[in-house]
């Protein structure tokens, strides 16, 4: 019994170390959303140019998801996780020295590659570590670290943006990344997972079915709505008459609402099928989106934002939990990386379109109506997914 307890404790300690991947991804995305209006003002950028910063970063994430997801199946999860985090940390050091808009874009692409590769590999590692409904619950709990990363980004921006500036914030992020690398050196590869030299084309041929198309549609809709809404959240707050400090403060409150959303989703994952959890949360997000687009006062904006945050991030956690269960171990990293990479196409388009729409004076309520429709499409796509086969998502195939 003592040995079993020790194994569980060891697995949970490993889980906590791996879950920091979500924290760093959110820390970077959150800081970027706070930095964007500051950099835009300093360099005299149009809204469409500001949106391009986020989109170029996300293009890097797409490339990182495709490449590093496949690499994890070839050289192992642990080594790939360390490589991606090193790329993220060094990239932020260089980014802090950017001298203009063009150099900022180029460096953000490589930072994005590190981030985009880290998250699917971390999800694959946790999927290898657990089985059954516990796998879904632990993946959703891992995704709750996203909220912690956003909170850290909010507090750093609130407390330090006026003292050390956006360059200093990036250096702080890089330092935390280097610390995480030291922690990940001590984790072990999952013993039953063997690295495979499966070519990317072979992996696609083996696993590309109708379910993959439906899954990619769901990922597209989740990331299109999430990045489109949340990357512009501080800017929308500013446009509604709030100061920079008020905007950061309100955004922090909205981010806190993510945590109970995650925990309820994790609990539901132990009670009902994960695809139903996803659909419920996507429809809840759609409700929050239409509310957020049609309110004007600060109090109602924060309330609608909390509803949006509660459901949208729970849906994000649910689809992260769902994806690895659809594929066998030898292609799990590749297909999880590809699914997230395809989803990040939506993450590119979302912020870019919002910037263009704002420049063209499209109303906020119309923009959020579009997000509501996309969320409904995503929920329908997942509900249409077939149930996993007996070998799919198994602990060892």
Locate the predicted segments by residue.
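Extracytoplasmic gate region of multi-pass secondary transporters
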Residues: 32-33, 208-262
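Cytoplasmic helix-loop-helix junction between adjacent transmembrane helices
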Residues: 107-144
């Amino acid at each position: 019994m003592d040995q079993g307890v020790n194994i569980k404790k060891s697995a949970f300690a490993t889980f906590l170390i791996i879950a920091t991947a979500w924290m760093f991804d959110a820390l970077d995305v959150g800081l970027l959303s706070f930095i964007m209006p500051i950099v835009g003002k300093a360099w005299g950028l149009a809204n469409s140019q500001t949106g391009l910063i986020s989109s170029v970063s996300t293009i890097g994430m797409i490339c990182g998801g495709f490449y590093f997801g496949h690499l994890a199946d070839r050289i192992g999860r642990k080594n790939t996780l360390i490589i991606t985090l090193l790329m993220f940390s060094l990239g932020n050091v260089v980014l802090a020295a950017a001298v203009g808009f063009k150099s900022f874009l180029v460096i953000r692409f490589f930072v994005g590659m590190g981030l985009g590769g880290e998250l699917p590999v971390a999800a694959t590692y946790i999927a290898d570590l657990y089985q059954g409904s516990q796998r879904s619950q632990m993946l959703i709990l891992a995704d709750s670290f996203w909220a912690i990363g956003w909170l850290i980004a909010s507090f750093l921006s609130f407390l330090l943006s006026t003292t050390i500036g956006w360059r200093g914030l990036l250096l702080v992020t890089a330092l935390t990344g280097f610390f995480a690398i030291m922690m990940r050196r001590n984790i072990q590869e999952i013993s039953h997972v063997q690295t495979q030299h499966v070519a990317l084309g072979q992996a696609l041929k083996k696993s590309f079915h109708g379910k993959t198309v439906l899954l990619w549609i769901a990922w597209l809709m989740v990331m299109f709505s999430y990045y489109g809404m949340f990357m512009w959240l501080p800017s929308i707050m500013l446009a509604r008459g709030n100061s920079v400090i008020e905007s950061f403060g309100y955004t922090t409150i909205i981010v806190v609402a993510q945590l109970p959303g995650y925990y309820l989703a994790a609990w539901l994952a132990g009670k009902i099928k994960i695809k139903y959890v996803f659909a419920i949360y996507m429809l809840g997000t759609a409700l929050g989106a239409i509310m957020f687009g049609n309110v004007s006062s600060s109090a109602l904006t924060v309330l609608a934002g909390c509803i949006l945050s509660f459901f949208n991030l729970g849906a994000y956690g649910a689809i992260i939990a769902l994806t690895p269960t659809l594929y066998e171990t030898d292609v799990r990293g590749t297909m999880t990386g590809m699914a997230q990479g395809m989803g990040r196409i939506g993450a590119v388009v979302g912020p870019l379109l919002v910037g263009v729409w704002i420049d063209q004076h499209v109303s906020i309520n119309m923009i959020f109506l579009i997000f509501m429709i996309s969320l409904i499409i995503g929920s329908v796509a997942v509900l249409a997914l077939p149930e996993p086969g007996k070998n799919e998502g198994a602990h060892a195939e």
